[in-house]
Amino acid sequence: MEMTSTQRLILANQYRLMGLLDPTNTQKYQRLEAIVKGGFGLELKELDKEFSDLSEAECLTVLNTLEMYNALQISYNNLPDKSALTPHRLQFAGYCAVREKKYLNYLRFITSVEGKYQEFMRCEHGCDSQTPMWDKYLKMLDAWRACPHEYHLSMAEIQKILNA
């Protein structure tokens, strides 16, 4: 993380204030203040770990994925015969917390802060799929977009999307 001296001073002062405001974490904030004041490059990278860059296209892909799962659920619920597919197959898996953390963070922002698609936060392990899902969701989105009626899917179309 590159910072000017002024930025470092401001951040160091913020950590000092946080230590005063939150006595239970004083040691943590003192450590962070020392890192920023010292300009220790290796440890400064630590501060950067919580930040992620998510492009507008990536945000839209996450939102489109949630909307696709919404359409899958609506279509499934409207089917007269559901025997060919279990409801578990329609459950949104989330994103890998290790390899896809930025997508998982955005998902949590959308559901928790924005209050949208909250029904998808019922996924297992806090929506940590524990395996990368981004590429799978892209294929599923392509299959979904190829369907003539995105919200009135047949059983065959639902299965085709899930198997993409």
Swiss-Prot record:
Disulfide bonds: none
Family membership: Belongs to the UPF0304 family.
SUPFAM superfamilies linked to this entry: YfbU-like
Organism of provenance: Histophilus somni (strain 2336)
InterPro entries xrefs: UPF0304_YfbU, YfbU_alpha-helical_sf, YfbU_helix-hairpin_sf
Signal peptide residues on this chain, from the entry's feature table: none
Protein name: UPF0304 protein HSM_1818
HAMAP family registered for this protein in UniProt: UPF0304 (MF_00762)
